[in-house]
Amino acid sequence: LVYDAVNKILNKNNILAPKLYTQRYDKNFIEIEDLGNETVFKILKKKGKNKLSYFNQIIKLLIQIQSIRNRKVKNFRNQNYTIPKYDKKILINEANLFCDWYVKNNLSKLRKKKFRKNFKKIIKKLTLKLKLKDNIFVHRDFHVSNLMSVKNQIGLIDSQDALIGNKAYDLASLIDDVRLKTVSYTHLTL
């Protein structure tokens, strides 16, 4: 269970993430720690909250995540797990999501097929030229709905897609979060 292994790495680095309490994986059952339902997103939507303090905590958490060096852990089956590297294959798969989600609903069937073929060719060509500098722990879903407020601390959920990747990935996820108008908050730190 990747989720548990990644959370163990986070916990070992003093980052609050749900712990696995019990599991019967063969019966499709796991019991994990409940971090509650107070997402940072809910807090930031409320009027009168000190939003700057939350953004400061989020940035400190991001720095802490990016400082993780030990990327190996034993999973609940006592097997070694190492966080994989973000590679060109993963990049191509993520680029293809554009076709799966956006193009699928916005082009005719004939245009979709032609677009998909051309898009894949262009993406493959671009990735051949790309030199990935992947050396940082990347959560890959680092946005305010996956950040939990727990007793004056920020916890992290939904970590199963973590990889070793580019340091800009999680920051871009946070800044470009469609649920939150971060532009209206950027003046707070300037």
Q: What do these predicted ranges mean?
A:
Residues I65-Q66, I123-L171, V178-K181:
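Active-site acidic catalytic loop and adjacent metal/ATP-binding pocket
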Residues G48-K49, A172-L174:
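Glycine-rich, phosphate-binding/catalytic loops in enzymes
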Residues Y102-K104, L174-D177:
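Well-ordered alpha-helical scaffold segments within catalytic/enzyme domains
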Residues L1-K88, I92, K131:
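ATP-binding pocket architecture of kinase catalytic cores
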Residues I32, I90, F115, L163-N166:
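A generic short alpha-helical patch detector that favors 3-5-residue windows
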Residues R71-N75, K104, S108, S184:
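Charged, solvent-exposed alpha-helical segments that act as regulatory interaction surfaces
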Residues T186-L190:
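Conserved small/polar residues in nucleotide/adenosyl-binding loops
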